[in-house]
Amino acid sequence: MSPNNGAKYGQVIFLVGGAASGKSTAIRKFIDSSSYKTINPDGVKDLMRQASEKGITGFEDLAGVDPNTPKGASVYHQKMRDTKISSRYSKRITSDPNRSADAYPNLLFDRTFSFAGEIENISKSLIRYGYKPENIHIVYVFTDVNIALKRNRERSRTLADDIIVQSAKGAKKNFIDLLFQRMKSAPVNGDFFMIVNERVITIKKSGKRVDRSGDVAKKVARTLGIL
């Protein structure tokens, strides 16, 4: 996948999907990410860990907490939500007042997008920075939650089961709301894709509306269990 014919500037991909859904595999196999700056929670967690090790005010409570354990991961997740540090990190990357109008970096947001208001808030911020709705694209990685739970238990960096379940539910709900235009305040109108069982479904192209009564929309709805 290479949105807008591989444009080198001004493109944004929201990679949507619950924890352990296979988003990293999707990037490796299906997305031409070489020209994108990737923003993901792991990078933010590493910054938080470094801050705690240096004794920076506000991160003392993370000292000695291992983010690679279920308990530690829950602590880091809650800290990210409480401080909104992930949003601030994204703003620092995107808000460069000295760049030219055609030099907005391509961005790949690799996160669950499972929280209410997450897609709306980030997309609105991007529009304020100068990005365009038709250049904000969606790639939803859909995986059965039981498969995600199994994957999570088999990898070295594990999360608590409730994080896996809730992130899967939240990501699915937000994607459905966006797809069927219930998320009216989100300025997102780029290419829409869904990845299921390592197959890519192209739902719509940039600038077009989703044909909610068409065959593709019905196929997606059946896959997601809403038809």
Describe the function of each predicted region.
Residues 22-23:
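Conserved glycine(s) of the Walker
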Residues 129-152:
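Conserved phosphate-donor/acceptor-positioning beta-strand/loop module used by diverse small-molecule
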Residues 110-119:
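Acidic, metal-coordinating catalytic cores used for nucleic-acid/nucleotide bond scission
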Residues 1-6:
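Pre-Walker A adenine-sensing motif
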Residues 15:
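Hydrophobic anchor at the beta1->P-loop junction of P-loop NTPases
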Residues 145-227:
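Conserved GTP-binding G-domain of TRAFAC-class P-loop NTPases and closely related GTPase folds
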Residues 18-19:
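The conserved Walker
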Residues 27-105, 117:
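Conserved substrate/cofactor phosphate-moiety recognition/catalytic segment
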